Design a protein with these regions (language model features):
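An accessory alpha-helical subdomain
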Residues: 174-259
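Cysteine-centered motifs
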Residues: 25-27, 34, 38
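Residue-level detector of alpha-helix initiation sites
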Residues: 66-67, 127-128, 174
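Glycine-rich, highly charged phosphate/nucleotide-binding loops
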Residues: 97-115
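ADP-ribose/adenylate-binding Rossmann-like module
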Residues: 119-124, 130-157
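E1/E1-like adenylate-forming module used to activate ubiquitin-like modifiers
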Residues: 125, 146-196
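Extreme N-terminal basic, low-complexity initiation segments
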Residues: 1-15
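Hydrophobic, well-ordered beta-alpha structural blocks that scaffold small-molecule cofactor pockets
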Residues: 38-88, 93-96
């Protein structure tokens, strides 16, 4: 349907895991009544860290508040095909729908909304709805995340530091998003633009390395000689001397080229 401008009087926010205490257990432990055991269990979970290519893939966000906006924006950055399910939405989400950046289904969630989707994210203050989205996604073997409720997630969203082509993910296994945000800020200050520029310059040399150096080990040594070289390419870039880094790469190419 066509998106309609609507200023919501209440923006749903995600429910913390504590909201499930005393309710029927919905996690993999199936304890009957929730006692929060699974929250502690999440800290022991060996998560498989991966980067997903979302370009053109359908991603569903349920919930039109500030948290939903945050998740929608994260998916759009990665070129996801985003559908928002919410009877009301934050004004910024409304604008994204009006400009065609997302599809807004302005109504309550329905089970069929997940058909054909890769990812579902529930960002509402309705515990029963969050559980329903989780169960529907699990039945479809989909990736699903109920914001701030780790037991109702089969993947968690790390805090991301993005600088050019670089992306650094910080995860606390759902234990403390606040700590992850602090780490994100500090890592962003430490690994700034010079690292992004170096990544671009090294990527420019990848074609030469693949065409010229016969083995993986040869290519590994070539790139490590630049990254860990003397002078330090990061320090050169901090001084604004990208040309000196290009010279380092050219010197390494001459040194590693087969005779």
């Amino acid at each position: 349907p066509t998106a309609r401008a609507h200023t919501a009087s209440h923006y749903p926010v995600s429910m913390p895991a504590q909201a499930y205490l005393g309710k029927e257990c919905v996690c993999q432990l199936r304890k009957g009544i929730c006692d929060q055991s699974c929250v502690q269990d999440m800290l022991q979970t060996p998560f498989y860290i991966a980067c997903l290519r979302l370009s053109g893939r359908r991603c569903v966000v349920v919930g039109g508040g500030e948290v939903g906006l945050e998740k929608v924006e994260g998916l759009l950055v990665c070129d996801g095909d985003v559908t928002l399910i919410a009877p009301e939405a934050d004004p910024e989400l409304t604008q994204l729908a009006l400009e065609g950046s997302i599809r807004w289904e302005q109504r309550e969630y329905e089970t069929g909304d997940l058909d054909g989707a890769l990812i579902a994210i529930a960002a509402t203050d309705d515990t029963d709805l969050n559980i329903r989205v989780f169960n529907d996604a699990e039945e479809r073997a989909m990736l699903v995340n109920v914001v701030d409720v780790p037991p109702l997630c089969n993947f968690i969203l790390p805090a991301i530091v993005r600088t050019g082509p670089l992306a650094v993910a910080i995860s606390t296994a759902g234990a403390s998003p606040a700590l992850a945000k602090r780490m994100k800020r500090e890592i962003g200050e430490l690994f700034g633009e010079p690292y992004a520029v170096l990544a671009i310059l090294l990527n420019d040399a990848r074609g030469w390395a693949k065409a010229t150096l016969p083995t993986y080990q040869d290519r590994k040594q070539f790139f490590e000689s630049i990254v860990n070289g003397d002078p330090d390419p990061i320090e050169l870039l901090r001084a604004g001397d990208a040309q000196a880094v290009r010279a380092l790469i050219e010197d390494a190419q001459r040194a590693y080229a087969p005779v």
